[in-house]
Amino acid sequence: MARLTESEARRQQQQLLQPRPSPVGSSGPEPPGGQPDGMKDLDAIKLFVGQIPRHLDEKDLKPLFEQFGRIYELTVLKDPYTGMHKGCAFLTYCARDSAIKAQTALHEQKTLPGMARPIQVKPADSESRGGRDRKLFVGMLNKQQSEEDVLRLFQPFGVIDECTVLRGPDGSSKGCAFVKFSSHTEAQAAIHALHGSQTMPGASSSLVVKFADTDKERTLRRMQQMVGQLGILTPSLTLPFSPYSAYAQALMQQQTTVLSTSGSYLSPGVAFSPCHIQQIGAVSLNGLPATPIAPASGLHSPPLLGTTAVPGLVAPITNGFAGVVPFPGGHPALETVYANGLVPYPAQSPTVAETLHPAFSGVQQYTAMYPTAAITPIAHSVPQPPPLLQQQQREGPEGCNLFIYHLPQEFGDTELTQMFLPFGNIISSKVFMDRATNQSKCFGFVSFDNPASAQAAIQAMNGFQIGMKRLKVQLKRPKDPGHPY
C-alpha cells in the first residue's frame, strides 16, 4: 500500500505543476481510475512504434492503441522535406502501466495489413538510456524469496518502480531479480549498501547487486563469447585475439610490402600467418609469447622479433639465386616456416648466411650484399610499431568491405565496431540512421584493411542469431560503372 500512496502523491503533484496540453490524439474513452484528460505520469514511457502501413495516420492508429489506456500523444513521423510517411510513430500514454501493457500485447505479436513484418512497440532510445542507470540486477537470492521479500530489502533506499523475480517455466525462482528505482541516486545507494553485504540462506556466495545490462550489452557479450570460442577452435581466428594482434598484423604487412618492392623474391613462408606462428617454439596458447621479449641493442623489438626469439633466419632468394641458408642450431619449426619446405642449397657467397642477422641488433655491415632500400626499411620497421593510418578512409581495399544487415535497432557505430574489432584492424564502420527519426535502419558497413579479416568476420558472424533475426554478413558489391543497377 505504501507504493500506491507514493505513486498517487507523484501524480497529484504533477497535476498541479504541469500545464494542460492538447496534443494530437489526446482524446479517448475515460479509462478506469479517472485519469484527467491530457495529464501523464511523471514516469510515463515514450514508445517507438515501427512497421506500420504508410497510409495510416494518427486517427487510424488511435483505435489500436487506446484500448490499453488513455493516449497522451501520438505522432506519425514524416520526412521533413517531402512530408512522406516514414512508417513509424512515437506514442506516449498518460499512465506508465498502459505503455507496458501495449508493449507486451503488440511488440512482434501482431502484423498490420500490408506489412511483411510484425509491429514494433518498444521504449524509444531516450527512454532506454534513461532507465539504464536505475535498474538493478540482484543475484544470489534465496530461491524461496518472493517479490515482497525483495521489496522489503530494497525499499529503505528509495521509491521502487518495478520489482520482478525471475522464474523458470515451472514457476520456481531462479534466485535473481530485477529492481528499478525512481532515480539513479537511489539505485547507486542500494548497490553500495547491499552488494556483497550478506549471504542469503541457500545461496552459494554473497549477494550480488549491480546495474542491469541493456539488451545491447547482452547481445555484444554473447557475440564476443561466440567469437572467442571460434578463435579457440579455428586457428585462422586465433591471432586477432592476442594482445599483439594489431601490431603483429601491421608489421607483417609492412615487411611484405618492403620486400616485394625491393626487387628481391620473398618466399611465401616468410610472411607470418596465424597457423605458422603456432609452430614456433616457446609460445603461449594463442601462438604468441606470454610476455614481450626484452629489447636487444637498444632497439624496442616486437614480441616475436628479438635476438633470442629468432634462432634462425633465412636469407631471401635474390635475383642471382644466392640460395636459402638456415642458421646453425636454428629452431626446426621456424626454419620450416621460413624456408617454406624448400631444400636449402649452399650459398654462393660465404657472407649470405650472416646478412639478415644484424637487422635485429643494428644494421652495420654487409650492406653491399643487398640493395639499401631492401634492408633499411626493415631495420626501421623493427624498433617501433607501424604508425596508424594518417587519414581515416571511408572504404578499404576491394574484398575488405562488409555489408551487415539485420542489426539490432539499438546498435550504433560504436557497437558495430566492437562487434567486428576482434577480426582485425577496422578502417571505418557505419550504421545507417533515419535522419527524420534518428532511428537505426538496421544495416551498416564495416571496412577492414585486409581481405583475410573480412573473410574471418563473414565466417564467424554470418547467420549469427539475435532475437528473431540472423545477421547477414557479406562482401559489399564493388562499384561497377558498367552495371549501375
Curated annotation (Swiss-Prot):
SUPFAM superfamilies: RNA-binding domain, RBD
Cell compartments where the protein resides: Nucleus; Cytoplasm
Domain of life from the UniProt record: Eukaryota
Residue span, RRM domain: 45-126, 134-214, 400-478
Family matches, as InterPro entries: CELF3/4/5/6_RRM1, Nucleotide-bd_a/b_plait_sf, RBD_domain_sf, RRM_dom
Stored SMART domains: RRM (SM00360)
Disordered: region residues: 1-40
Signal peptide start and end residues: none
Compositional bias per record (Low complexity), positions renumbered to this chain: 12-28
Pfam families per the UniProt record, alphabetical: RRM_1 (PF00076)
Tissue specificity statement from the Swiss-Prot or TrEMBL entry: Expressed in brain.
Record's compositionally biased regions (Basic and acidic residues): 1-11
Gene Ontology molecular function, alphabetical: mRNA binding; pre-mRNA binding
Family affiliation: Belongs to the CELF/BRUNOL family.
Cited function: RNA-binding protein implicated in the regulation of pre-mRNA alternative splicing. Mediates exon inclusion and/or exclusion in pre-mRNA that are subject to tissue-specific and developmentally regulated alternative splicing. Specifically activates exon 5 inclusion of cardiac isoforms of TNNT2 during heart remodeling at the juvenile to adult transition. Binds to muscle-specific splicing enhancer (MSE) intronic sites flanking the alternative exon 5 of TNNT2 pre-mRNA.
Protein name from the UniProt record: CUGBP Elav-like family member 5
Species whose genome carries this gene: Homo sapiens (Human)
Lineage: Eukaryota, Metazoa, Chordata, Craniata, Vertebrata
Protein's gene: CELF5
